[in-house]
């Protein structure tokens, strides 16, 4: 497929594509943009944010901020007041959150209740657990795993975006990101569905903790750099940024 054929295909079949970055042998060999995007522009990568957070958890493990993915979630929130009669949340681990096997006390994600709260981590904890116990059943969650970024922030003493900048983004050449907090529910909704070019931002809750299930804005070249890091088993320019064991595990 030549460039003209690619452009014709995207125009006819994939009009939502805004950027492409192709790597070969560790170097970018082709890039292109559509829909008024520039190469440096970012877009909301939505649930791909979850994969970036998984890498950050691995880095937190490497640096000793987290001891093990088998650690109970409540180890990190000893001040959390467990609801009366709740017997499941005490057993939920980081691994349950990462593998989407954590149990939640809802059928449909409580966007309004969590996103209107002052502390999304605590609000997410309020919905963790339940009467059914640990079933091992897969339950996809976008809001519940906000607990993961809460753990990273609490153990490292850094805002998640600063943790990511220091230990992942800047080392591989991704531009420094900053937090973005929506002031209204309407602004929040607009951000989640907006297809216009964005800046280097990570959506956050009122506490400044980056959302774990969505909210990160990356360019295609940023995504390619993450992909290359994973292909290279966590090594960039001879430096191990995240353990190869973790790359294999995730």
Q: How should these model regions be labeled?
A:
Residues 4-13, 38-49, 55-140:
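Active-site-proximal loop and beta-strand segments within enzyme catalytic domains
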Residues 7-38:
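A short, well-structured edge-of-sheet supersecondary motif
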Residues 26, 46-65, 97, 138-169, ...:
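Alpha-helical scaffold elements that line and support the substrate/ligand-binding pocket
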Residues 32, 122-130, 197-207:
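The feature captures the short pre-catalytic strand/loop hairpin that immediately precedes
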Residues 63-102, 155-213, 218, 245:
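Active-site helix/loop module of the DD-peptidase/beta-lactamase fold
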Residues 107-108, 233-239:
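Substrate-binding/catalytic groove segments of enzymes
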Residues 216, 237-250:
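A penicillin-recognizing enzyme superfamily signal
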């Amino acid at each position: 497929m030549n460039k003209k054929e690619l452009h014709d295909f995207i125009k006819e079949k994939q009009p939502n594509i805004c950027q492409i970055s192709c790597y070969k042998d560790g170097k970018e060999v082709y890039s292109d943009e559509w829909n008024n995007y520039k190469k440096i522009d970012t877009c909301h990568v939505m649930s791909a944010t979850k994969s970036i957070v998984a890498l950050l958890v691995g880095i937190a493990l490497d640096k000793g901020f987290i001891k093990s993915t088998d650690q109970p979630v409540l180890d990190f929130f000893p001040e959390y007041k467990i609801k009366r009669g709740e017997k499941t949340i005490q057993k939920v681990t980081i691994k349950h959150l990462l593998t989407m096997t954590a149990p939640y006390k809802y059928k449909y994600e409580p966007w309004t209740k969590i996103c209107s709260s002052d502390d999304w981590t605590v609000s997410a904890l309020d919905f963790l657990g339940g009467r059914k116990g640990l079933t091992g059943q897969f339950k996809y969650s976008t809001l519940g795993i906000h607990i993961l970024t809460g753990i990273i922030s609490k153990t490292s003493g850094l805002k998640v975006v600063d943790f990511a900048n220091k230990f992942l983004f800047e080392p591989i050449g991704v531009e420094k990101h900053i937090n973005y907090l929506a002031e209204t529910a309407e602004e929040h909704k607009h951000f989640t569905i907006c297809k216009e070019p964005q800046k280097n931002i990570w959506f956050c809750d009122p506490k400044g903790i980056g959302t774990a299930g969505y909210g990160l804005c990356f360019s295609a070249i940023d995504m390619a750099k993450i992909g290359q890091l994973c292909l290279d088993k966590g090594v960039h320019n001879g430096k191990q940024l995240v353990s190869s064991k973790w790359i294999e595990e995730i």
